[in-house]
Amino acid sequence: MGQSQDNTQLTTASPQAEKDLSSNDNPPESEPAAPKKGARFWLVFIAIALTTFLAALDTSIISTALPTITSDLGSNSLYVWIVDSYLLASTATIPIFAQAANIYGRRSLTLIAVCLFTLGSGLCGGAHNTAMMIGGRSVQGVGGGGILTMSEIVVCDMVSVRERGMYAGIIGGVWAIASVIAPIMGGAFAQNVSWRWIFYINLPIAGVVLVALIVFLKLARPPTGTFKEQMSRIDWGGSVLLIASVTAVVLALSWGGSEHPWSSWRTLVPLILGLVGQLAFFAYQGAPWLKEPTMPLRLFGNRTSSTLFVISFVHSMLLFWVCYFLPVYFQAVKEASPARSAVMLFPIATTSAPGGVIAGIFITKTGKYRVWHFVGFALMSISCGLFTLLDDKSSIGRWVGFQLLFGFGTGFVFTSCLPPILASLPDSDVATATGAWTFLRNFGSIWGIAIPAAAFNTRVNSSLDKVSSGTVRDMLVNGGAYEHATKTFIQAFNNTPRLKAEIVQVYMDGLKLVWQVSIAFSVLGFVLAFLVKSLTLRDELNTEYGLEEKDTSKEKSSEEGNAS
């Protein structure tokens, strides 16, 4: 697969370019071996996995219950912010948590993230109006973004670079399973108990996790100065630029094709301002006076890390692309209920998780990761091509088989990206690099909904001349087709089979373009994989923030719980 055979051993002393980092053939004698994994390690890892499960649940658990929530609270057109407020808050705060983890320590930031998520869950569960719900979702989103960031950082601090693929695969599997079962849980709570339990269910689980983290998450923390010195290290300007630019982009992508046409100034102005703001953010990150930027440009200073950041963005975009538009096919073409369509996505969840673990184990055993980029994107490209064949007559075997290919492919790619990113950078950049990786994945998910939505709406608009009813054409134009992609809407035309067939054909036309465009991005990921270099993933663990050893904690480090 074009994999080089260099026996690169990385050092961690300085943020050199990749060429410099990969020049040493022998590991430094002072580099410590990875500690054995005792009961405390596994208790912390399980707690981290549970927090990831909760954060993943709340990205999509309200999707099937949203009509019930909006009806109960009288949200009307504000319903979209019940979803977008969480996504916006979590995405914008990810790099900020990553930088703060280097200043205030991993333990304190992890506990803060879980506490904010729990507080937000309580506010949402007790919400009596839309404003309180949106506020609660925003608080929950900040906590969720912190959980995603800190869980990856803490795991990276506990295991060596070579092992990170396997543990990332497990965390990724937890995420995939939670994302698929979330809509089913949301619908079940809304129909059988109360939609409020969608949020209340987080409280006891988060409480147990919080206790476990307080008791067992004892991490080393190097001295970081006084409170004033710590505050002066925060990149306030970069944080403001990042939050403002991400907010503008999310607003534009939320409005485009639904609230306002894509050609409307109300969509274009915030989109352009947001993209310009992000360029300004990266320009500011390179300012010579900025000692500790939120997202240092050195993270993108070598070919391997910069390429893998782009690959991770594309991969996340494709994952959300498929998971948001297969339900449109299931509900509008195959006439499945929302809960049933969530179940029909199980093939992706049941293969992406084991696929990630398989790739992670292979990477841990051999240190080879490039092959998984090629295999993963090859499977994703093939499956996206096969999705174009789906129609109203497709058998269960077809849509299940196509998803199995995509699921394994996405699992392979997810697990094999972060370890080589960290291998190409010094260990001092673990937190910021992991934060950048998580941010780009979240940001990619936003585009993974917006781009196919634009393609779908464009093709639907051009295909509406096939629909004989002017009333129905008005219902489906300019984003209406996505809104009406439900079993109830389609079956309302059972008494007019010709009109129903015309409507279904419009949906199939729109979805075909969605899958055709996805092929291009899948192939792009495959091509980008050729730019990734083969680096040695070291077995040693060299970090200042790992789990404290009982016999050395008093002499070499101070517990975060006792600091500041």
Swiss-Prot record:
One of its GO terms (cellular component) is plasma membrane. It comes from the Eukaryota. It is found in: Membrane. Residues 1-15 have a biased composition (Polar residues). The chain crosses the membrane at residues 42-62, 78-98, 108-128, 141-161, 170-190, 197-217, 236-256, 268-288, 308-328, 343-363, 371-391, 404-424, 436-456, 512-532. GO terms for molecular function: transmembrane transporter activity. PROSITE patterns: MFS. Keywords: Glycoprotein, Membrane, Transmembrane, Transmembrane helix, Transport. Residues 1-35 are annotated as: Disordered. Coiled coil: none annotated. The keyword Transmembrane applies. PANTHER family: MAJOR FACILITATOR SUPERFAMILY, MAJOR FACILITATOR SUPERFAMILY (MFS) PROFILE DOMAIN-CONTAINING PROTEIN. MFS-type efflux pump; part of the gene cluster that mediates the biosynthesis of the mycotoxin lucilactaene and the lucilactaene-related compound NG-391 that act as cell cycle inhibitors with potent growth inhibitory activity against malarial parasites, moderate growth inhibitory activity against cancer cells, and no activity against bacteria and fungi. Belongs to the major facilitator superfamily. TCR/Tet family. This is MFS-type efflux pump LUC4. It comes from Fusarium sp.
